[in-house]
């Protein structure tokens, strides 16, 4: 994992900036984007034409993913969707790749798991929802193992995996943030894994800067709202974000879109110093030792990676709740009750 401010982090930051415009670097990379797009199109066509067959795992599958690289708010969306499906009478389970973990075979994730063995996002989902969560690079194998261990599960939510065509799915939800499709180019010239025109059942847009939605069919606003911060060492100790307004605060985030976390805090009335860490940052040591601040605000995704050895009394965790449009929930429930995996 690259260090904060290291060469890899700087390269990632530059690409992220370049992907928002059609500058010289983006145009120079378009030949590689054409090759990437051709390979991706061949994979899609192989399944669309029946040359390869997706695997039906026996229950409906909802894939929550994106067509861009980087964080868009998928994890809080998965958590909210699991809660909504449970409220609608389903018994959901979750599968994920387990990015950042050394996982080769289907592995169960429990609230007591370690992030290094499960992945930070699956561990957060397990802790927040209490639903069965299994991880494996092969999501079909993860889903089959989950069903064998939990035969009462009647719907599976796939955290990411939109491009994992081998897993048959009933519903596809694509999540965007305010960057939408960036410059509209495929990787590596732009942020797109697939064209924006890719079919999906619904689109969710998480944009803290604007309430306007793009003119796409079946598009819904995704609102991410911060809750009261809880103390890392004493989780029952909570403070409204407004109480940090007159303190020296550092906001740090090792997520795909750290600026979105910082914007959330600013919208809550804070003016923190900020530090963007690499996505899935491992926290092998404390990067905040030399920071002269009263409080350090971090994300839940980062908090699950901090074990008992962390004793920095300044650390506070800011939970985020996703509010799903009731019309979106109704659409998903209708499709689950009316269709088989395909």
UniProtKB/Swiss-Prot annotation:
InterPro entries: LpxK, P-loop_NTPase. It is an enzyme of class 2 (transferase). Pathway: Glycolipid biosynthesis; lipid IV(A) biosynthesis; lipid IV(A) from (3R)-3-hydroxytetradecanoyl-[acyl-carrier-protein] and UDP-N-acetyl-alpha-D-glucosamine: step 6/6. Pfam families: LpxK. It catalyses: a lipid A disaccharide + ATP = a lipid IVA + ADP + H(+). ATP binds at residues 68-75. Its EC number is 2.7.1.130. GO terms for molecular function: ATP binding; tetraacyldisaccharide 4'-kinase activity. Keywords: ATP-binding, Kinase, Lipid A biosynthesis, Lipid biosynthesis, Lipid metabolism, Nucleotide-binding, Transferase. GO terms for cellular component: plasma membrane. GO terms for biological process: lipid A biosynthetic process; lipopolysaccharide core region biosynthetic process. Transfers the gamma-phosphate of ATP to the 4'-position of a tetraacyldisaccharide 1-phosphate intermediate (termed DS-1-P) to form tetraacyldisaccharide 1,4'-bis-phosphate (lipid IVA). Belongs to the LpxK family. This is Tetraacyldisaccharide 4'-kinase. It comes from Burkholderia cenocepacia (strain ATCC BAA-245 / DSM 16553 / LMG 16656 / NCTC 13227 / J2315 / CF5610) (Burkholderia cepacia (strain J2315)).
